[in-house]
Amino acid sequence: MSKYSEYKIVLVGLGPHAKRIYINLFKKYKINLGLLIDLQSQKEKIKEYLNKHNFTETELFLIDDSYKDLTSLPYSISDDLQKVIKLKNIKYAIISTEPKAHFMYAKFFLENDVNILLDKPITAPICCNSDINQARKIKEEYNELCKLYESKKNKINFMIQCQRRFHEGFIFVENILKEIIQKYNIPITYIDIYHSDGMCAMPSEYLTRENHPYKYGYGKLFHSGYHFIDLLT
């Protein structure tokens, strides 16, 4: 038995990132994936994937696709999810959904005293690149989560997953910037970022793509491009 098997974890979202990072870690360290939350439309694909990778004991909690763009879980769903989490004694959550759903799940787990590892960015309101009120929600949702966590942080941890802080390339760039600033005593006044993540989105994908999408009113800056902003801060 693994020393990590006592950690019962709920994973929210089984997308490409979760499969590449988290599932491999669960397998490597024999971590107990007690519960997986995803959309009803993904049921058969998820069951097939879990069986293929020997996660036969993992329970599924599926949510109707019509709720995927909400900012809070409907009471009937949150009540059922609370019961499942308590029954399975789950104390740790990894949120790896599309960013527009981050706030909904982060708020739920904070309210239920569950430790959280949240993929970056913290939140991504729909159409925040074209609607000023939606853009303001980035700060509003951040403040709301901070306030919630402030009242809970003696009991639980809430961490943001930003793994490229430890990437050799990013560390190299960061060190060069620090060296120049210190040596010449000059600030950084302008940054030009060009980033494509090694892929090209076809025109049709702007309307259909669900992984690293553009159709929800945010794009690369809220996905892989986020790491450059994180580096600068």
Regions found by a protein language model. Name each.
Residues 23, 82, 147-153, 204-210:
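Short amphipathic alpha-helical segments, especially helix-boundary/capping motifs
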Residues 120:
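Short basic (Lys/Arg) and small-residue
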Residues 1-2, 182-183, 223:
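A general structural signal for short secondary-structure junctions and capping/turn motifs
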Residues 1-112, 124-147:
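N-terminal glycine-/serine-/threonine-rich beta1-alpha1-beta2 phosphate-ribose binding loop
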Residues 162-168, 203-233:
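Mid-domain beta-loop-alpha active-site segment that forms a flexible
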Residues 125-202, 218:
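A contiguous active-site-proximal alpha/beta segment in oxidoreductase catalytic domains
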Residues 15-16, 100-103, 107, 143, ...:
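A structural signal for well-ordered alpha-helical segments within the folded catalytic domains
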